[in-house]
Swiss-Prot record:
Known partners and oligomeric status: Component of the F-actin capping complex, composed of a heterodimer of an alpha and a beta subunit. Component of the WASH complex, composed of F-actin-capping protein subunit alpha (CAPZA1, CAPZA2 or CAPZA3), F-actin-capping protein subunit beta (CAPZB), WASHC1, WASHC2, WASHC3, WASHC4 and WASHC5. Interacts with RCSD1/CAPZIP. Directly interacts with CRACD; this interaction decreases binding to actin.
Keyword hit for Lipid biosynthesis: no
GO molecular function: actin filament binding
Described purpose of this protein according to its UniProt entry: F-actin-capping proteins bind in a Ca(2+)-independent manner to the fast growing ends of actin filaments (barbed end) thereby blocking the exchange of subunits at these ends. Unlike other capping proteins (such as gelsolin and severin), these proteins do not sever actin filaments.
InterPro entries: CapZ_alpha, CapZ_alpha/beta, CapZ_alpha/beta_2, CapZ_alpha_1, F-actin_cap_asu_CS
Protein name: F-actin-capping protein subunit alpha-2
Phosphoserine found at: 9
Amino acid sequence: MADLDEQLSDEEKVRIAAKFIIHAPPGEFNEVFNDVRLLLNNDNLLREGAAHAFAQYNLDQFTPVKIEGYEDQVLITEHGDLGNGKFLDPKNRICFKFDHLRKEATDPRPYEAENAVESWRTSVETALRAYVKEHYPNGVCTVYGKKIDGQQTIIACIESHQFQAKNFWNGRWRSEWKFTITPSTTQVVGILKIQVHYYEDGNVQLVSHKDIQDSLTVSNEVQTAKEFIKIVEAAENEYQTAISENYQTMSDTTFKALRRQLPVTRTKIDWNKILSYKIGKEMQNA
């Protein structure tokens, strides 16, 4: 280990540490951070050199955060990043500071939204919240309305997780949907992501994503929001069903092929009658 320390520069150590942190499984950021901290053995170097990794992890994972004084959680995403550690809560029209290491929101202040697209954003958010409440018991969603390349754009983000450390597994669902508000029809683009980590007597990760494209009829705000939710629901249901079916197929075929069905003797042991076996008698006489 001493030779390795001599070979690696501080910059290289931080680069490796940052990679570990960015790729931490959902719900296991603190565990990975603490392990990396012990390995690096230099808190100042870790905090200063890997700060970007803390931020990138939260942005990638759509980390939900509760703001004191407000009922609903908001997601930390690149779409709400205002710079200098500040983020947007479009529903409550506030901005706030976010500590990427502690995952805490502070200093909420009023923030003026894009008025030209706000009515569309609100309609989509209302419909999406109802959808998320029905399909994701622990789900959180945030909807942004902004101008991108001069076009009014709606961006909808969904996050839902189950952290079961006592049962040795953690998992997170993320989806992101975008469409521009254009007359008659527009293109909806989405990406769905699933990440699950199971680590009891082993270490298995499921990391999957799917890109979606569909056309959306644009009319008034409320009707367009309803049609948008139909697209989201159909795509996410289809993806989740496909994942479940593939997982069952793997369980029935691939995983079974990895283990021996019977001992080398091709005979199952009846443990209730172990004393009747020769080995049992030998153990009894020993």
